[in-house]
Amino acid sequence: MEGTTKTKKWDWGQDVLCQIRNANMDESVIFAHQQRVLEALASKDNRTFPIFDTCRLENGGILRLPQLDQKIISQENDDIGIVAFVPAAGASSRYLAPLIPLLDAARMRDAEACAVAVMKMEMDGVMSCPLPSSIKLLLTALKSGITKVSDDLFEQVVREIDAPKALYPAVLEGDSFLCLKRLEHKNLGGLLGEIYICPPGRSADFNREASTVASSLESMFIEQDSSLATLRFESSGQVALDDHGQISSVPAGHGALLPLLPRVRELFPKARAVFIRNIDNISGNSSLVVEATRSFKDNFCRTLSLMDRLREAASQHDMVQLKSIGQSILDIWGITTDAADDPLESLFSRLFHTNVTKMPEDLQRLLARPLVLMGQVPNSANDVGGTCVFADVDGWRQKLCIEVPHVSETDRQVFLENAAKATHFNPVFVMAEIPGQTMINAWNSHPFWLVAKKSWNGRQVYYQESILYEMLGCGHYANVLFVEVPRAVFNPHKSLKDAGQKHLRHWIKS
């Protein structure tokens, strides 16, 4: 098969190598991506992780949030700074699919084509959804006569439809997804600040939009530039070049954001952890959502505080304290043990479900991994994907938040499409301890990637994407707990009609 021969770095040619360096890309990372593309092209089967069983409440793979004493956790919450971390660089192409004919017509300054596109939108019920103000202005202009559409209005329509999804209206009043997320963070309280990952060159636009929401919470913006991207490759494995001989970069998946986590500490020096949610998942601030989120945060802080004490005891080789603290963590999460059980072994094998070969020799390695709390919402019986499972990852039985591309067809039918087995799924509701550079480096060789096949410039190209929630949600790389949270925290907006005709008050209670 074409692409089975490994390509060497120097096969790129000096010009391509210079372009990669000038784009601030790490050539060793791009080379690794290239080898993965070649591996995928050479393989007859997609890379999958065989599933032993799903994680469920009944088998301890998923846990319920414990009730904590507020007096105990108040100080810990103050000591453990958490920053909201929101990936928001994604385009809105899928969300705005019904508006593409209007966008194309506005780009051509074709008022008649705009009128046809708007008529179709009205027939499809799109005009009742949250839309940019320019579309309503355009509709007024069209009703007044097609000759009255100005170039400025055409430009405004193009600019607003072509905006990143974060800046798009989420409610009828026009408040954007970014504004709603900021309001949610404001109402939640207890956060050090918030960071939004935005497209290249759009940080000023994001900052301007965030400033429309009055809040003492500091907002920071990190642009997802070429250093977080990968390259497109031909089926031969060679770097794909455009008609001008230039390389073509493309986002390398949310997993590429992982190296950004240490930067959170640079922006917020007191930060210990991040709270990750998607920009287009609106939770609102109902009492159910706020209480569940605070409980989630409190349990994370309590557990991380005890893990810190565990690390301190390990540094002093204090086995008495180690066993006592380990038992305290088990008690919080309701893990019962026998008197003969070693609390440390039980902590990692029965709570974190990770591989323990020998104690206490394994302890430093296990404690070096970040603590991750990954929320899981009940499955409506129609949700497939983002399922937490016990799987074979490179020969080890591991707890894993698995994505559909890494599931065989048989396992998909037996586990993911079986509502009795796939009882919960990942809504992207995650609190993760900020990892050190050693752990970031360890993730460089992770197996949680896939190769996307896309049409580009009239030909098929391939590129690697890393899957963040498999990386954070694997028991080999993190001390991860899957925890049930209410379905109310999960309201994704994947199409315009998901927004419906909702007003701001539907989500944010004053």
Label every PLM stretch briefly:
Residues E2-G3, K270:
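Residue-level detector of intrinsically disordered, flexible termini
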Residues G3-R21, E27-S28, S74:
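Non-transmembrane, aqueous-exposed alpha-helical and coiled segments at domain scale
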Residues M25, V29-T54:
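Extended, charge-enriched "interface" segments that sit outside catalytic cores
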Residues N46-S380, F390-L400, H406, H493-S495, ...:
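Domain-scale recognition of functional cores that engage charged ligands
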Residues M319, Q327-S510:
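OB-fold and OB-like single-stranded nucleic-acid-recognition modules
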